[in-house]
Amino acid sequence: MCLRSLFLVSLATCVVCGNPSSPPVVDTMKGKVLGKYASLEGVTQSVAVFLGVPFAKPPLGSLRFAPPQPAEPWSFVKNTTTYPPMCSQDATKGQRMNDLLTNRKEKVHLQFSEDCLYLNIYTPADFTKDSRMPVMVWIHGGGLTQGGASTYDGQVLSAYENVVVVAIQYRLGIWGFFSTGDEHSRGNWGHLDQVAALHWVQDNIANFGGDPGSVTIFGESAGGFSVSVLVLSPLSKNLYHRAISESGVVLITELFTKDVRPAAKQIADMAGCKTTTSAIIVHCLRQKTEEELLEIMEKMNLIKLSSQRDTKESYHFLSTVIDDVVLPKDPKEILAEKNFNTVPYIVGINKQECGWLLPTMMRFVPPDVKLDKKMAIMLLEKFASIYGIPEDIIPVAIEKYRKGSDDPIKIRDGILAFIGDVLFCIPSVMVSRDHRDAGAPTYVYEYQYYPSFSSPQRPKDVVGDHADDVYSVFGAPILRDGASEEEIKLSKMVMKFWANFARNGNPNARGLPHWPQYDQKEEYLQIGATTQQSQRLKAEEVAFWTQLLAKRQPQPHHNEL
């Protein structure tokens, strides 16, 4: 009788809270994990959340600058209800980036560690092994030097669209992309972590209600770039079935390099390591503490584009390389040969990619700097190698982008439009064409909206800034206060597009604006307060750069667009 009463009390408790009375426990191939349930106000579907599930061994000691290894098994029920540490990076900058980009209402203080190969899972609470829901694997951005999985709460996307959301982490900066260009440290460790996470998903996600045969990889900025790398990589074949690159593709020149030796030597010199051989450099760097490598990262001033820096003596990014493992060839060759994973692909940009966030983070062209034409040319010539364009065409480009104006504000706006086009917009169009021509179903968008919870420092005329689309994708207007009905409706529409694509390889469904496939007519979707079809994204700019670069021979050591 007593046991029966206890059962009825437990059942009543379950009904009141809307969740099962016991927290979720799931078997993985390495051991059991304990999660928690989360509910959204006004939404009947609650979500099971698992935070910090290990997908690889901690990449410490001899595993620094080495491929990730499978996690060790455990015999207990592992508690996965707290955020894992983000991968090693500057803590202040990492926290600031998290606070700027998170879709959460509350502020979460995150930790940082070299032991960071974990993933977070959000799945509808009523999942079973037979649910077979689409899986959406998120790869965060941050210039391959910053960011983490826990900035992005996947519960809204999971609850509203009945999908399993997996947010993964990968090694960053020196830990993720240090390369000597040979067998001692090939590089691309961060991309190998991404591949390892996808293997983990294939092996384990069914137990969380996911369908390993329906996996979509999606990411933004360096995450979108990483998605594009994985689309080209033979290493990731059959590990996913659809892909979405938001504001980032493999042709972003700043995130790819052919000559790794100068940066490797600079890092070794800063660390006080002998540079006699690659083996000596790698052995020495493996002995350094995490704090010592963080100091080197700080001295390198990665991502910052200060006009005071000597670009010939410094490196702004630690980049993806041709390693014969992740990438067997230059991405341009792979695209030209059409020898890649021709999965359905969404590629998108924001209307003003270099509107406010990136110039602020990179400390480039501060608003109080009065630019004239001569100074603008000098500034852009200084960073020509980063944009991947020959210096001698910059004066012509400045004429195009300043539109005949000598107004310092308009010249500054022109420079930022120039950078946004060269780094994000033109490469995205070129990659979309390559995928279309290879026979992959391709969809293209431009996001045009000003989020209500943007930083108060951001100018009101920056509509569609870098990363703005991420707020809609992860349901920020639903989680955070202050969003208008228009903004909530926009987010629900974007989540529906993304989830439809994850389900079917096609974003369209009844009740949504029609999103045309990107074919020879180059139709695409403008997403914003008014969502509508348009044609030939950035047509004038694409034609300008294509013609300009075709007239000139590339300079050595530059990766041209």
From Swiss-Prot:
Signal peptide limits:
1-18
State whether keyword Phosphoprotein applies: no
Gene Ontology cellular-component annotations = endoplasmic reticulum; endoplasmic reticulum lumen; lipid droplet
Say yes or no: keyword Glycoprotein present. yes
Query: What domain of life is recorded for the organism?
Result: Eukaryota
Q: Which reaction does it catalyse?
A: a carboxylic ester + H2O = an alcohol + a carboxylate + H(+)
User: Which residue pairs form cystines in this protein?
Assistant: C87-C116, C273-C284
**What's a Pfam family in this record?**
COesterase
Compartments (UniProt record): Endoplasmic reticulum lumen
Provide the E.C. number(s) assigned to this enzyme.
3.1.1.1
* Chain location of the short sequence motif Prevents secretion from ER per the record: 558-561
Q: Which UniProt keywords apply?
A: Disulfide bond, Endoplasmic reticulum, Glycoprotein, Hydrolase, Serine esterase, Signal
Sites of glycosylation? N79
* Annotated GO biological process: lipid catabolic process
Supply one GO molecular-function term.
carboxylic ester hydrolase activity
CDD domains listed in its UniProt record = Esterase_lipase
Report the active site residues.
S221, E353, H466
**What assembly does the database describe for this protein?**
Monomer.
Family affiliation: Belongs to the type-B carboxylesterase/lipase family.
Give the function comment from the record. Involved in the detoxification of xenobiotics and in the activation of ester and amide prodrugs.
Q: What is this protein called?
A: Liver carboxylesterase B-1
